[in-house]
Amino acid sequence: MIYDKRFIGLIIIVGFIAGLVGASYTHLLHGIQHFVYNYSSADHLSFGAAVARVSPIERLIPLIVCGTIGGVGWVLIHRYGKGVVDIKTAVSGKMDMNPITTVLHATLQIITVGIGSPLGREVAPREASAGITTFLVKHFDIKQEDRQLLIACAAGAGLAAVYNSPLSAAIFTLETLLLTWNVRAMSAALLCCGLATFVTRQAGVGDVIQYTMAQPSLGSHYVEFSIVLGAIIAIGVVLFNITQSKLPAIHRSSPVMIPISIVAFTLIGVLAMYFPEILGNGKAGNELTFTNDITWTYALGLFGSKWVAVLLALTAGAYGGRITPSMMLGSNLGIVFGTVWAIAIAPVSLGMSAFVGAVVFLGLAQKMPLTSCVFMLELSRFSVEMLFPIALTMGTALMVEQIIQSKLNSAK
């Protein structure tokens, strides 16, 4: 295992690129949110609070605009771009990402999420960083395996930059993109993600804590509860994946996608008139559940409306991340089940239930169980004592999911 100067230099450059991309997209996202929902950083409002304070019609209109911009934009990108290549395909070396098409595609994701698309923002900086890195490494005579490693590190560093989460982003790179834990890959991922986080912090974003609230108490009776919660979350994830697989397949370059997008986002806007927290990636919903500042009936409504909103956005051909939407689904399901448990069996901390539910739903839905355990602690800066119920719930959920999937596969 040799670290030549050129490879180390490229790792540093890629980290800086991802950091600048993450900072740029963060500022762009906030600027769009401030413009659309008429608030500024001086108001000291979260996006969720800003959306909740406007009238229902002022939530509907931006979503109609969002559907129009997204529908037209993605049809144009698919018709006239050089082809949208996903990160895993690029890392595998099967196809290269075109930097211009990729950056335009990623920027459109940020624009639509800023307006109110119910998908996440994290795919955009990952894709843009990987696309720019693909262009960069073409100009260097390096081995194919190093090229793949650099592209994967760029994608992971984009995640680190936008969420201020260097360790979990490095684990994500290894767990989901490279599928290896060798020292060369680990050192590259850790250095790249750490540098990207540093650059973003220095570029006006700062050391942001995504969830600034007190850690929920573990309470009592949480061992048995955590195990059963894992089974409930697993069932929820399996059903969510099934509903996604049933969505109609329409070629995204077809002009028919434009009216479909407008109608789908209009329906999302109608849902947002009653459940404003579904707009954006889902952070607003998590802020309510983690602090238990929500009734179980409203949590159930948020769970169902976010589920439908994500399916509508995907039907519309929209792109975006699934990390925070998955967290929001898990946190609301955790609140609902925790309430039922507290009534029927024994008291349980609903804040803990929501937090653990978010971690485990994310881990299963995005197939990154190790990443999600660390990711949520980095986002919240909660104590590592939360890892105990997380481990119990995640372990049970993974087992139950595999059992259900094997039965479904054998039934086909």
Task: Briefly describe each language-model feature range.
Residues 1-412:
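Alpha-helical transmembrane segments and immediately membrane-proximal extracytoplasmic
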